[in-house]
Curated annotation (Swiss-Prot):
Pathway involvement of the protein, from the record: Amino-acid degradation; L-histidine degradation into L-glutamate; N-formimidoyl-L-glutamate from L-histidine: step 2/3
Family annotation (InterPro entries): Urocanase, Urocanase-like, Urocanase_C, Urocanase_central_sf, Urocanase_CS, Urocanase_N, Urocanase_Rossmann-like, Urocanase_sf
Keywords, comma-separated and alphabetical: Cytoplasm, Histidine metabolism, Lyase, NAD
Top EC class for this record: lyase
Function, as annotated: Catalyzes the conversion of urocanate to 4-imidazolone-5-propionate.
Full protein name: Urocanate hydratase
Record organism: Bdellovibrio bacteriovorus (strain ATCC 15356 / DSM 50701 / NCIMB 9529 / HD100)
Length: 552
């Protein structure tokens, strides 16, 4: 990858700008925040998370992006193509300051093979979801969605209570690292298997995992002790899940909940085959890509066979959106899709309400600014008990990574309310600098991903990606600060298209108008999408909240 080992990137903080406006300054700080070593998985290679999800195509492009943002006027827009800055256009003050298109390929050519060829030539970059769109906030970014999934699983299968229950999972990377803490927040014990010891160490340091077991017997003894006491604890175990899951079956261990967040979306760089360490896998990959891919696919097949066996033994089993089932099916596991994805199982009712991951970042770098926003959120939504519980636990347990940030799931109507309130806090000087508001591309109306967010849609429209494109167009029209349109995030090349928006609350009247437009229209796309697919809940929400569908 030609990494730059000596270079350490961190976002500037404070209320002094180096750019010509706070909107440009926000993008300038957030791309650098994505590469802060406490956030990024491999910052020396510009890799933020998710296998090879990058913030910029190469170091030259990264430097040019920073230079361009410093020069950018308040009525200009920077264009970025797969992590490479292309040019600056005169637009207008309410237009986005940056428009990004990452990893997009014509469908017939949308394969890892073709992408890898282009990547080798320096013509492409994998943007994942929030890596190439500059709004990754570390593992907290996914944690509330994971928490919501576990809590909903508890509601559906365990009478609303996960106390004394065990969640078994694998993968402690940028996304998967949220699982142990989310499980503990939901009241369960978590056993998380991870092949890379540096990732385990990182999660331990940031308090996302409580303990590390020395071996499988030690892990099981700890789990037994904590579940008997009704204590919620998370334990990491170094190992390969393709091996460990079968050892657990031999030991007659069946968890209550079973899922996986290894980097199966990228079989070449993300998933480590059975029998290899991170180092030996790297050598193997460099020596023989074809043989490596076969080994990875064989391991994924074995991994999924173990999951299916545990499902048959009573474990509530679901896919966590990394495309593991599809890989296993390609490797010969015909019934790999016998267990559902997490969205149809637990998240879709939230999507019907225009609910999704609303995140905000304090550009000042001062953690107290997030404390101020947390308190303001409590006053704004006193009736949302799960949200209040989440804010309390997040304050207590979540270590900030890079610029201080918070995430929570908010519905249609609530997002605009929160955005305007943040803008007011900036205007009144209650926070020390503007606030950046964004979200994951995993949202109610911004993604087409038939093996994840749009799996098993009621009307069979799983693969229709017009909605993601419309979402990007709508957010551009409404004046988001930067808008991104990506391909392949979460599940890999050929399997998804998705859009993101980021908007800055700088305390001005103009910002208030933009915030109201963007934070209303963005979740409205989710209500439209699900209403169109025939979901009654989306129909009811549209009627109740005045969403102007032409099909009510």
């Amino acid at each position: 990858m030609g990494g730059n080992m000596s270079r350490v990137v961190k976002a500037p903080t404070g209320n002094k700008m180096v750019c010509k406006g706070w909107l440009q300054e926000a993008a300038y700080r957030m791309i650098q925040n994505n590469l802060d070593p406490v956030i990024a998985e491999h910052p020396e290679n510009l890799v933020v998370y998710g296998g090879i999800g990058k913030a910029a195509r190469n170091w030259e492009s990264f430097d040019k992006i920073l230079e361009a943002l410093k020069e950018l006027e308040n009525d200009e827009t920077l264009l970025v193509q797969s992590g490479k800055p292309i040019g600056i256009l005169k637009t207008h003050e309410d237009a986005p300051r940056v428009l990004l298109a990452n990893s997009n390929l014509v469908p017939k050519w949308a394969t890892w093979e073709h992408f890898n060829e282009l990547d080798k030539k320096g013509l492409m970059m994998y943007g994942q979801m929030t890596a190439g769109s500059w709004i990754y906030i570390g593992t907290q970014g996914i944690i509330q969605g994971t928490y919501e999934s576990f809590v909903e699983a508890g509601r559906q299968h365990f009478g609303g209570n996960l106390t004394g229950r065990v969640i078994l999972t694998a993968g402690l990377g940028g996304m998967g690292g949220a699982q142990p803490l989310a499980g503990v927040f939901a009241g369960a014990c978590v056993l998380a298997v991870e092949i890379d010891p540096t990732r385990i160490q990182k999660r331990l340091e940031t308090k996302y995992v409580d303990e590390v077991a020395t071996d499988l017997d030690d892990a099981l003894a700890r789990i037994k002790k904590y579940t008997a006491a009704g204590e919620a604890k998370s334990i990491a175990l170094q190992g390969n899940m393709a091996t460990v899951i079968h050892q657990l079956i031999e030991k007659n261990f069946t968890p209550d909940l079973l899922t996986d967040q290894t980097s199966a979306h990228d079989p070449l760089v993300g998933y480590i085959p059975e029998g290899y360490t991170v180092e030996t896998a790297k050598t193997f990959r460099e020596q023989d890509q074809k043989a490596y891919l076969k080994a990875a696919y064989d391991s994924m097949a074995k991994h999924v066979r173990g999951m299916l066996a545990m499902k048959d033994r009573g474990a509530v089993t679901f896919d966590y959106g990394n495309n593991l089932r599809a890989r296993a099916q390609e490797a010969g596991v015909e019934n790999a899709f016998d267990y559902p994805g997490f969205v149809p199982a637990f998240i879709r009712p939230l999507f019907c309400k225009g609910s999704g991951p609303f995140r905000w970042v304090a550009l000042s770098g001062d953690p107290n600014d997030i404390k101020v926003t947390d308190d303001a959120m409590r006053k704004l939504f006193p009736h949302k008990k799960d949200l209040l519980r989440w804010l309390d636990m997040a304050e207590e347990r979540i270590a900030f990574q890079g610029l201080p940030a918070r995430i929570c799931w908010l519905e249609y109507g609530e997002r605009a309310k929160a955005g305007l309130m943040f803008n007011q806090l900036v205007a009144e000087g209650k926070v020390k600098a503007p606030i950046v508001i964004g979200r994951d591309h995993l949202d109610c109306g911004s993604v087409a991903s038939p093996n994840r967010e749009t799996e098993a849609m009621k009307d069979g429209s799983d693969a229709v990606s017009d909605w993601a494109l419309l979402n990007a167009l709508v957010n551009t029209a409404c004046g988001a600060t930067w808008v991104s349109l990506h391909h392949g995030g979460g599940v890999g090349m050929g399997y998804s298209q998705h859009a993101g928006q980021v908007i800055v609350a700088d305390g001005t009247e103009k910002a208030a108008r933009r915030l109201e437009r963007v934070l209303t229209a963005d979740p409205a796309m989710g209500v439209f999408r699900h209403l169109d697919a025939g979901y009654e809940l989306a129909h009811d929400i549209a009627k109740e909240r005045g969403v102007r569908s032409l099909w009510l």
